[in-house]
Swiss-Prot record:
A motif (Important for interaction with 14-3-3 proteins) lies at residues 20-25. CDD domains: SAM_SAMSN1. The modification Phosphotyrosine is found at Y160. Residues 123-146 have a biased composition (Low complexity). This is SAM domain-containing protein SAMSN-1. Residues 37-48 have a biased composition (Basic and acidic residues). GO terms for biological process: negative regulation of adaptive immune response; negative regulation of B cell activation; negative regulation of peptidyl-tyrosine phosphorylation; regulation of intracellular signal transduction. Induction: Up-regulated in peripheral blood B-cells by IL4, IL13 and by CD40 stimulation. SUPFAM superfamilies: SAM/Pointed domain, SH3-domain. The modification Phosphothreonine is found at T76. Residues 163-224 form the SH3 domain. PANTHER family: SAM DOMAIN-CONTAINING PROTEIN SAMSN-1, SAM-DOMAIN, SH3 AND NUCLEAR LOCALIZATION SIGNALS PROTEIN RELATED.
Length: 373
């Protein structure tokens, strides 16, 4: 019988078995060395000619070298990132505490990993603290912010200039508690400009350029009829000297800024102000209610002054009225006169005529009364 020759495959397998064991042994040895010395492992592997026989041993060595290179690169990147992070933390601590940061040594990989873990834990704890503070202080900051906004508005804004819905005179003193900052301190005789009236009884007003609350039971509301004569009297005093032009008239009542608007809208003379009304002033964009009242009251006073001057320019009827008032007592003492003038010659005939008229009247009355009986 013929004997078959052994194939090349079987021969290769016999020769490759020790090579595989040696390659795996070298791989384990290099892996253990890489844990202790990661930086020198690549150089030792590249310069170590242990496996110089066969193509398959070269491919296995190349694969192991790539894995070691990747591990070495990852270690170096971790070191660099850890160093940068530690430097950033140290700089922040130096800025906060004003102390010099202690240098860290990261030459050993174990120390580097330990510092990385510590820094990561510290950063996580700091982030959690900051987030907790922000979340817990969110509600309080909102509430404090609103109160601070209100206080800033009261402090920064100027005095309230209107609108007002009336005026009130205080008849009872009231001093609020020191904790009540919204209420007004009022005294008897103070006049408060009312801003708002609420059905609860707490009104809002302004006193001495301060806006606050007060109870309606401490005040008496001043009607417009009571307030109007006071303004008219003041304007009469200011207009004691008659103004001739519109500009002089407005300067006397301290409203000269409205001269241009009045002149442009047809109010050129003082006579044009006779028929002016509040609606006309609103159409002229005079928004301040106090200015409108002053202008209207001044125009009314100007008309009254003209009427008084016209009466003074007519002395005869005034003198007659005075004479009549003086001689009234004398006229009451005199007998009444019929208005007919009777001469002395015809006095007897006049008496007879009067008697005949009286007789005829009496007869007529008697005739009328008889049938009624």
């Amino acid at each position: 019988m013929l004997k078959r020759k052994p194939s090349n495959v079987s021969e290769k397998e016999k020769h490759q078995k020790p090579k595989r064991s040696s390659s795996f042994g070298n791989f384990d040895r290099f892996r253990n060395n890489s844990l202790s010395k990661p930086d020198d492992s690549t150089e030792a592997h590249e310069g170590d000619p242990t496996n110089g026989s066969g193509e398959q041993s070269k491919t296995s060595n190349n694969g192991g070298g790539l894995g070691k290179k990747m591990r070495a690169i990852s270690w170096t990147m971790k070191k660099k990132v850890g160093k940068k992070y530690i430097k950033a933390l140290s700089e922040e601590k130096d800025e906060e505490d004003g102390e010099n940061a202690h240098p860290y040594r990261n030459s050993d990989p174990v120390i580097g990993t330990h510092t990385e873990k510590v820094s990561l834990k510290a950063s996580d704890s700091m982030d959690s603290l900051y987030s907790g503070q922000s979340s817990s202080s969110g509600i309080t900051s909102c509430s404090d912010g609103t109160s601070n906004r209100d206080s800033f508005r009261l402090d920064d804004d100027g005095p309230y200039s209107g609108p007002f819905c009336g005026r009130a005179r205080v008849h009872t003193d009231f001093t609020p508690s020191p904790y009540d900052t919204d209420s007004l301190k009022i005294k008897k005789g103070d006049i408060i400009d009312i801003i708002c009236k609420t059905p609860m009884g707490m009104w809002t007003g302004m006193l001495n350029n301060k806006v606050g609350n007060f109870k309606f039971i401490y005040v008496d509301v001043i009607s417009e009829e009571e307030a109007a004569p006071k303004k008219i009297k003041a304007n009469r005093r200011s207009n004691s000297k008659k103004s001739k032009t519109l500009q002089e008239f407005l300067e006397r009542i301290h409203l000269q800024e409205y001269t241009s608007t009045l002149l442009l809208n047809g109010y050129e003379t003082l006579e044009d102000l006779k028929d002016i009304k509040e609606s006309h002033l609103i159409e002229l964009n005079i928004e301040n209610p106090d200015d409108r009242r002053r202008l209207l009251s001044a125009a009314e006073n100007f008309l009254e002054e003209e009427i008084i001057q016209e009466q003074e320019n007519e002395p005869e009827p005034l003198s007659l009225s005075s004479d009549i008032s003086l001689n009234k007592s004398q006229l009451d003492d005199c007998p009444r006169d019929s208005g007919c003038y009777i001469s002395s010659g015809n006095s007897d005939n006049g008496k007879e005529d009067l008697e005949s008229e009286n007789l005829s009247d009496m007869v007529h009355k008697i005739i009328i009364t008889e049938p009624s009986d």
